[in-house]
Curated annotation (Swiss-Prot):
This protein binds to the 23S rRNA, and is important in its secondary structure. It is located near the subunit interface in the base of the L7/L12 stalk, and near the tRNA binding site of the peptidyltransferase center. Keywords: Ribonucleoprotein, Ribosomal protein, RNA-binding, rRNA-binding. It comes from Helicobacter pylori (strain HPAG1). The keyword Ribosomal protein applies. Gene3D superfamilies: Ribosomal protein L6, alpha-beta domain. This is Large ribosomal subunit protein uL6. Part of the 50S ribosomal subunit. GO terms for cellular component: cytosolic large ribosomal subunit. Belongs to the universal ribosomal protein uL6 family.
Length: 178
């Protein structure tokens, strides 16, 4: 029995939800999300409460049950409060600036890295900290991972782009021979 799937999702008043066949539609004042579900999952929406039930008793139906419960919950949380990731840029001469629909990064390369900000994502830059905000959890995480991949933190001095809660395991450098 799926612990995630059997949980009932409370839909706040700021989010409107509707079911059209196997599609779930969510929207708040400015954004809209759609979730296409599999036919092995039954959707029930009553009194601003969303629940899922597996159609069969096989393992595949139970797997879809939990998956779609988690995806719908993430959409509701994203539309009501939103998701955010914080990245820190560490290193001498490493700089971050917010341009016109681009994020400009100076990460020690011979050229500046320009990252186009995708639709639905908002970025705030303070000193060497990048805050990525959005309503789509997958998109926020993907953008953060792409920015981090330009210069991941290295284990000797810790220079690079890292998540704010990431712990870098440091290595000792070479020792001199006597």
């Amino acid at each position: 029995m799926s612990r995630i799937g059997k949980r009932i999702i409370e839909i706040p008043s700021s989010v409107q939800a509707s079911v059209e066949g196997s599609k779930l539609l969510f929207k708040n004042g400015k954004e809209k999300h759609e979730l296409e579900t599999h036919n092995r999952v039954k959707i029930t929406l009553e009194n601003n409460q969303l629940s899922f039930q597996p159609v069969g008793e096989d393992a595949q139906s139970r797997a879809y049950w939990g998956t779609y419960g988690a995806l719908a919950n993430n959409i509701v949380i994203g539309l009501s409060t939103g998701f955010s990731k914080i990245l820190e840029v560490n290193g001498v001469g490493y700089k971050v600036a917010l341009g016109n629909k681009t994020l400009d990064l100076s990460l020690g390369f011979s050229h500046p890295v320009k990252y186009p900000i995708p639709a639905g994502i908002e970025m705030v830059v303070e000193k060497n900290t990048i805050t990525i905000k959005g309503s789509d959890k997958q998109k926020v995480g993907q953008v953060a991972a792409e920015i981090r991949s330009f210069r991941p933190p290295e284990p000797y001095k810790g220079k690079g782009v890292k998540y704010s809660d990431e712990v870098i395991i440091r290595k000792a450098g070479k020792t001199a021979k006597k």
